[in-house]
Amino acid sequence: MLPLSLLLSFGLLQPSGTVINFDSSTLGRVPPGWSVSMTSRGLPPRWEVRRDLSAPTQPYVLAHLSNDAGADRSPLAIFDRLSLRDADVSVRIKAVAGREDEIGGVVWRYRDPGNYYLALANALRHNVAIFRVQDGRRVQLRVPVPHDIEPNAWNILKVAVRGSRFQVYVNHRRVLEVYDHAFAQPGKVGLWTMDDSLTYFDDFRVYPK
């Protein structure tokens, strides 16, 4: 039997948290335990497990691949096996391509495709932003913060959720903090992208607090 330290380093066991690296999922499919949805209208989202040799955890990632420039749609991949109020939620994001946006984000306290919180990192506009999506409309919780998000490279996006306080980190550096009381109840967590962004995700981590 492998010692506990090795199990932790391989991502096979994590103390009091959930770590998903997609490496045991089936290529070309949505991973088990995840569902696909979308805010607004446009071409259907296309999420699937894909091979990427640059992945932080080799060899697979979860990718959003459909392209619908100008539709202002927000494809979502929701992890259905958790519902929580407070947590640290993080993911590694690789913004591969996009003419209008190169963007990826995490969502929390997700109720349905029209109601959730969202933090995003934009490699085209080089900023980080946080929103409340309510009744299908994005409500900006503060002005986006300029921050260098390297395109076609892996960046860590994390949100620390404690009651009404939300802190957003990029590559372990805190970038912004806001307070909002609209959605106080527990909800699901997941991944988000927008419009024509081709975005890869890996090493999704959720630690309840």
Task: State the predicted function of each range.
Residues 10-40, 202:
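Extracellular carbohydrate-recognition regions
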Residues 134-156:
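Short, aromatic/His-centered strand-loop micro-motif at the edge of beta-sheets
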